[in-house]
Amino acid sequence: MAKGGAKKAAAAAARAAANRMLADNRQARHQYEILETLETGIELVGTEVKSIRNGKANLRDGFCLIRNGELQLHNVHISPHTHAGNYFNHDPLRTRKLLAHRREIDKFRGLVDQKGLTLIPLSLQLKGSWIKLTIGLGKGRKLHDKRAAEKEKQSKKDVKAAMERY
């Protein structure tokens, strides 16, 4: 009976390792009000996959555009792989194609064109052996909106702390 428990624990640990966060754009959640999210695939070359798995991706300045009916990821820096020669390495800031269903792309295109919203990369995560990018439909926050959101967050934190004390 003890062996079965060890196998289950090992399997759970393997699943947790297979589904992990590789990069997070925390700044985007501060600068934008995220209205909707979408998980997409991302077209990468081998050295980019190795660099992302090593945590060498920066989503902070990134944005997404819809061109020719395709989602494209711009200005996301993925560092060159250290153990590959310069000839085989990738361009760190190249435009990358995102993989999503046609109806999802059309839905986001309508929202971006109509309301003046923007598409922002939020996080890179590993799902099994696939690297997925979560993008968000965001509306830019003004300075007073950021302050109000920070104040609301702090008040929720205070209420939670007070509830735990009693």
Swiss-Prot record:
Keywords: Cytoplasm, RNA-binding. CDD domains: SmpB. Its main location: cytoplasm. One of its GO terms (cellular component) is cytosol. GO terms for biological process: trans-translation. InterPro entries: SmpB, SsrA-bd_prot, SsrA-bd_prot_CS. The keyword RNA-binding applies. Residues 146-166 are annotated as: Disordered. It comes from the Bacteria. The keyword Zinc does not apply. Belongs to the SmpB family. HAMAP family: SmpB. PANTHER family: SSRA-BINDING PROTEIN (PTHR30308:SF2), TMRNA-BINDING COMPONENT OF TRANS-TRANSLATION TAGGING COMPLEX (PTHR30308). This is SsrA-binding protein. It comes from Synechococcus sp. (strain CC9605).
